[in-house]
Amino acid sequence: MHVFAISAVVITVSVIMGAIAFAVLIVRKRWLSIAQLAVFGGLCFAAAELLKPLLPRPYLINLESNPNNSAPSGHVILAAAASVMLLCAVPRVLRALVAVIGWAYTVLVGLSVIAAQWHRPTDVIMALLIVGGLALLALATTFASGMDGPGTRVSSASVQIVGSVMLTIGVLGILYGAYIIWQIQPGLAMSAEWTNAGAYVSTALLTAAVSALVLGITLAMRQLTASPLTKLGLVGAPPAPPKR
């Protein structure tokens, strides 16, 4: 995990993922999708750079720490955005696999920056939610060229299974993580040692759960925009009557 606490590694891996995404779209000749993902990436970059100096760093407990704001995490935004871009670029047969790979990569980066004491857990959660929200807005503006080709607009068993599992893990993980925080909250203000285990578990659980929720929703939304649930979108255009 410590390798993802190296800034150059995260930047390099994320840039490679983004480059692969654009290369796939160029090969598939999805020109409007290229513009769509370029705007999405630009907004994610702007959020990482502009929000940090503007947002306050709230006082949580009586603990000596850096007073400067560290939210949202730029490295997590970069990793999550690269994962989303690759997920939106690949064809249907690869979407579920890319979602799982992107989830694992994002979780590793998120936990690494927390373990390296670059960020608080809330910085990572905020970054994930920002990317998820921007991804949904971007997918809501999907053009016709972003759909699967006529005749290939079909449902995907892998997307249904993986998407359902990720969404379930996300929702249940967030609920259980919130329950753990509620249980240890009385001791956090006093930095009680008995809260350490709960803090570690809730941090890892919420990072993994929110990542799963973001990638799971993005996976489902991408499938819906690529193969809308209509006769025209799901199975392609109906055959035209013969001309006389």
Language model features with spans:
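Arginine residue identity/basic-tract feature
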Residues: 28-30, 57, 92-95, 120, ...
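Membrane-embedded catalytic cores of phosphoryl/pyrophosphoryl-handling enzymes
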Residues: 63-202
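Membrane-interfacial, low-structure loops and terminal tails that flank and connect transmembrane helices
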Residues: 145-160, 226-242
